[in-house]
Curated annotation (Swiss-Prot):
Its main location: cytoplasm. GO terms for molecular function: adenine phosphoribosyltransferase activity. The gene is apt. This is Adenine phosphoribosyltransferase. Keywords: Cytoplasm, Glycosyltransferase, Purine salvage, Transferase. GO terms for cellular component: cytosol. Belongs to the purine/pyrimidine phosphoribosyltransferase family. GO terms for biological process: adenine salvage; AMP salvage; purine ribonucleoside salvage. Its EC number is 2.4.2.7. It comes from Klebsiella pneumoniae subsp. pneumoniae (strain ATCC 700721 / MGH 78578).
Length: 183
């Protein structure tokens, strides 16, 4: 099933926009409203699964926390393993970490050292692409473990915040279901 304009419009309409959140001047795109609509949630998983069903994906990686909500069901539908990438000290086994820049400081992500094997063909899934910092760090973690990142897939792309261009510089193709301007 290729996504139709009607399906994509349905998904877009299921995402609420909240003005002045988390601070004045920001228009927040709330993907949790899509999750509250079982038709929209199922459709988003179906469309992502359909796109990647014949791509030879061996692992799906989801970033904390909303990436888990989309990545895990896609992995299940594809019949492959799901790998969580988390904030520091949230994973129980041995991990490697990658630090990345935030607007005001830095943060870090971790992955289990045995979660990705050399040669794994990985799909990275998250709810939203903005500046690309989180996915940049996630891609670096996967590559350090010998995995090949096939694509990065998102529900929402805030297309004017530069995330897609940042990831393309890393050789990562981005796919998103719903484009919005960033604010």
């Amino acid at each position: 099933m290729t996504a139709t304009a009607q399906q994509l419009e349905y998904l877009k309409n299921s995402i609420q926009s909240i003005e002045d959140y988390p601070k004045p001047g920001i228009l927040f795109r709330d993907v949790t409203s899509l999750l509250e609509d079982p038709k929209a949630y199922a459709l988003s998983i179906e469309l992502l699964t359909e796109r990647y069903k014949d791509a030879g994906i061996t692992k799906v990686v989801g970033t904390e926390a909303r990436g888990f909500l989309f990545g895990a069901p896609v992995a299940l539908a594809l019949g492959v393993g799901f790998v969580p990438v988390r904030k520091p000290r949230k994973l129980p086994r041995e991990t490697i970490a990658e630090t990345y820049e935030l607007e005001y400081g830095t943060d870090q992500l971790e992955i289990h050292v045995d979660a990705i094997k050399p040669g794994d063909k990985v799909l990275v899934v998250d709810d939203l692409l903005a500046t690309g910092g989180t996915i940049d760090a996630t891609v670096k973690l996967i590559r350090r473990l010998g995995g090949e990142v096939h694509d990065a897939a998102f529900i929402i792309n805030l297309f004017d915040l530069g995330g897609e261009q940042r990831l393309e510089k890393l050789g990562i193709h981005c796919y998103s279901l719903v484009p919005f301007p960033g604010h």
